[in-house]
């Protein structure tokens, strides 16, 4: 079941992708216009999704393939108690690897790196400074304080987050990970008690989006 979504980079859509060890399923949760969508499928199914930023029409593009047998649920205005979180150390290594080799990379990944150059790296001048001072890591949980990093950006441009998402998605593709997930989301504020069920190899980030067009 292939899908292609284009969103206007102006409003907010919250999304979360995580693996539930309790249910033994990969779960995608989205919130659009106060409506919550949940997609669940078995762990032995391949999910191939990629996020990129289209500079020409200022849109965020999400493309991918879901298994044919996919459970989709919908609930309106469901109250949820939530907290911020982000991923652990591998993300820093992935990003550093691509930045160091950006002169030999082309296509969407090249565009993502150029976006990072424009919106983040040039702000600090030194990528090590960016990592050490801005990507704070909680030593107990191993989670990045990524939300504060985004808020600290001078321009707070959603494109940097989309660029980071693209890099991580592409890394999973190149390393032939079977359970590839979307590297999405204004860190979909996950319910705190579910933290123990999360697979910390899942990536959470923050984007801005608006009207969905399937």
From Swiss-Prot:
This is Protein OPG176. Gene3D superfamilies: dsDNA poxvirus. It comes from the Viruses. Tetramer. Interacts with host MYD88, TRF4, TICAM2 and MAL. BCL2-like protein which disrupts the host immune response by inhibiting the TLR4 signaling pathway leading to NF-kappa-B activation. Acts close to the plasma membrane and targets several host TIR-domain containing adapter proteins including MYD88, TIRAP, TRIF and TICAM2. In turn, blocks the host NF-kappa-B and TRIF-mediated IRF3 activation. Pfam families: Poxv_Bcl-2-like (PF06227). InterPro entries: Poxvirus_Bcl-2-like (IPR022819), Poxvirus_sf (IPR043018). One of its GO terms (biological process) is symbiont-mediated suppression of host cytoplasmic pattern recognition receptor signaling pathway via inhibition of IRF3 activity. It comes from Vaccinia virus (strain Copenhagen) (VACV). Belongs to the orthopoxvirus OPG176 family. Keywords: Early protein, Host-virus interaction, Inhibition of host innate immune response by virus, Inhibition of host IRF3 by virus, Inhibition of host NF-kappa-B by virus, Inhibition of host RLR pathway by virus, Viral immunoevasion. Induction: Expressed in the early phase of the viral replicative cycle.
